[in-house]
Amino acid sequence: KKTITVRTGYFVINATNGDKTIKRSTSLKDSINDQRNPGYCFRILNTSYVIFGLGGNMLTLDGSWKDLGNANMSGWINVEPGGRLYIERFARLINTFNNEKKSGAPIMTYGDTQINCEIGRCKGYNGGAIKNIKGTLKVYGDTKIHDCVSVTEGGAIHNSQKGTLSIEDSEIWNCEALEEGGAIFSKDADSSCVIYSGKIHNNKSGESAGAVFSGYGATLVIGRSTSGPEIFENTSGGSGGGVRCNGGTGSDAGGITTFIRGTITNNTSGKHGGGIACGEAGENGQSKLYMSYMTISNNTCTESGGGIWTPNNIQGTGTEYAIIQNSRITSNTCHKYGGGISVHGKVYVSNCSIEHNFTGDRGAGIHITEGGTLKYDMGTISDNKTLDSITGTGIYVNGQLKINESARIAENNVVYLPKGKYIE
């Protein structure tokens, strides 16, 4: 009926003697549902430390969204700076909509939050399940976030303002952002998102990034040396069916992205980059990319870069050239240029298999635009196809191609050089 405020101390809240539910009141007469200023069910302040669902039976935290209809509602938990919240696997959060001030999420955290539980059927304005601002958010273990919606960005999670987000061994699916980041949205300089492992699938966005958006100066890391996440069957209305990295608009657009290991498969983009679309850097930003040991396959886009799309001012993380190495880029499709990779800036490709990609126009394996430069070293380009079987089944060169003798381009693939273009 009213907000429970934890000002100090350590508390463990479990269900005993059977499953239990803590539910938001459905009466608009109660203070928690004051339509001028609806409250959170829990507020965790200062040095307080609260754990839900550490053991015992299932504890359900219910936000009563379906019962309250179109009423003004706030989220379930607000963790303020210095507060600590852990939700463990014997708890779950459901049926919560935060529409208060058009900026909130069911869980709002500025502190230290760890999630190892189910979150489902929730909705927010920035983050369908969780919004992390300046805090540390760890999502791990048995976490399952599903069927959540953000009216803006981050269908499941929104991370910003120097927020630190890590995801490991978790699953996020059937979430939707009406704008960007069907599952995850991370932005701002000094913010970071690290996805070590897990599954992110069947999410969608109205604009870019069907699964994961990172931009406006943020850092994104996918995978680790021994394993990586599976990002599959996501759909975006704009660029980046799977991942939109170094994204954004305006002077602060860009970021730093490192792909260490993982798979990005069967994603669909309504613009560029069926698997991955890397964004252009703004005048105050940078767009840096390093990729190794990735599988980018069976992705589709309506424009260019069926597998990967790279921008004009792309760089490496410490090198002049963005680096794509030791990876498989296979069976991707685009309607225009670059079935496997669309190169607009300086890109170094080494020891990659670029095979069985298709384009309806030019450069089934790789398309190099005017102003783009590709250094190609080792690896194989084979069995890629264009609609007319002429215009660069292997590589279409409208920019510069620098190729090492150790690289292999199969006889069934063609390097197409328009008049005035050459190979170094």
Locations of regions flagged by a protein language model:
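Extracellular beta-strand-rich solenoid/capping regions of secreted or surface-exposed proteins
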Residues: K2-V12, S25-G55, D62-Y86, F97-T113, ...
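Extended aliphatic helical segments
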Residues: V6, V12, V50, V79, ...
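Ordered hydrophobic segments in well-structured contexts
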Residues: V12, C41-R43, I51, W76, ...
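Right-handed parallel beta-helix
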Residues: T16-D19, G53-G63, R84-F97, T113-K123, ...
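Glycine-centered small-residue motifs that form tight turns
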Residues: G39-Y40, G69-W76, K101-I107, Y125-N132, ...
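Hydrophobic aliphatic residue packing
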Residues: I44, V79, I107, I130, ...
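Extracellular beta-strand/loop-rich repeat segments of large surface/secreted proteins
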Residues: Y396, Q400-E424
